[in-house]
Amino acid sequence: LICSLEKFSGCENGKTIIIGAGKLGMALLEYSGFEEYGCTVSAAFDKKVTEPIKLDSGKVIYPMEDLSRFCRDNDIKIGIIAVPADAAQTVLNILCENGIKNIWTFAPVKLYKPADVLIRYENLALSLAHLKSQIIE
């Protein structure tokens, strides 16, 4: 069913990258459940990385300088933003400059985007607070 929906929607290519290789970015990079839904997390990028780092899983964390080439060579469609709020707008701008129009962000900040870019905001603290407000005792 998932394959049929992907083909119907034209979204067979779920090639994804992560920007930010801190704790959250690494957890997302190593999570294997995305592939079940047609998304392949290809790599991560981080400003603190100066040389590519290959993980035991085979995935690689690259320096930010490699982002443009990687996006061009790998037909990346989705970008995940896992950076602090003060860096998120810059990261979004870089992703947009590289043709990535589908964004999933964990940064707790409103981002300004071109009209043809889709952003899905994920606020983990807000989700937990919402659950807390509905505690059943």
Residue ranges and their predicted role:
Residues L1-N98, F106, P114-E137:
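Hydrophobic, well-ordered beta-alpha structural blocks that scaffold small-molecule cofactor pockets
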